Design a protein with these regions (language model features):
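Active-site cavity-forming subdomains of large catalytic enzyme subunits
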Residues: 130, 134-149
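Mature N-terminal, pre-catalytic/accessory segment of carbohydrate-active enzymes
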Residues: 2-18
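Conserved small/polar residues in nucleotide/adenosyl-binding loops
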Residues: 1-4, 225-231
Length: 235
């Protein structure tokens, strides 16, 4: 039975077309795809229900926000449906009052990059319209505009994620920074840079959906961040 299941599924794991020089790598690509597609944990309890979920290393039986954006981009190489499901796991209904997005781990909004990847691959207006208001809610919390978020509580307007997780960009930050309490006054450049990229991605989606008022909001955010980042940066 297992052999039959494998034979039925193996066709969808065929390595993508490649130049002749890379043909020797085809098996490795197929094996990596197989690992990715079976890297699933169950059950994971979230939002009042049990789900199956892709998780880093098949070891952590929980959700991981920043990892899962990258996992979704990998899934898009094999299954756009699985990639969308991975994205949708972290998005909330536009009228949600409980949470702006599903958060665990570093405040790195990789779901916006996954959204852009899916739009580039599908050109689907339906996908754009479904995800846009959910990602807008995510964006507004990430930028201190929604749900009591404290990410933008400094006069500079630069973003600080420390109230939600101990590191900023998916790495372990300098211990001395935390030992000296620097996280009350310091903003990591990477957080505002991600905000800038998220604004640009949503601006493109808003343009596609004809949301001119939203486009203006993102354009103002992009202009302000371009100005305030170099003004307030220290080396």
């Amino acid at each position: 039975y297992k052999r039959q299941v494998w034979q039925q599924a193996s066709a969808s794991l065929a390595a993508p077309s490649a130049l002749p020089a890379a043909e020797s790598l085809a098996l490795g690509q197929q094996l990596m795809n197989a690992v990715l597609c079976t890297n699933v944990v169950y059950p994971v309890y979230t939002r009042g229900q049990y789900i199956r979920h892709y998780t880093p290393g098949r070891w952590w039986d929980c959700v991981y926000t920043w990892d899962s954006g990258f996992i979704g981009m990998g899934l898009a190489q094999t299954s756009l449906r699985n990639a969308f499901d991975c994205l949708n796991t972290y998005l909330m209904p536009p009228d949600s009052v409980d949470a702006a997005f599903l958060h665990h781990g570093s405040m790195v909004p990789t779901q916006f990059y996954l959204y852009a990847e899916l739009l580039n691959r599908t050109g689907s207006r339906k996908l754009a319209a479904y995800c846009y208001p959910r990602l807008k809610l995510y964006y507004r919390f990430f930028t201190g505009q929604e749900g009591g978020s404290t990410t933008a509580n400094l006069h500079s307007g630069l973003l600080r994620p420390w109230d939600y997780f101990y590191n900023s960009g998916g790495w372990d930050d300098y211990p001395l920074q935390h030992a000296r309490g620097g996280n009350k006054l310091v903003t990591p450049v990477v957080t505002s840079a991600y905000y800038l990229r998220a604004a640009k991605i949503l601006r493109l989606a808003a343009k596609e959906l004809g949301l001119k008022k939203d486009m203006k909001e993102y354009e103002q955010a992009v202009s302000y961040t371009h100005l305030t980042l170099p003004t307030n940066s220290r080396v």
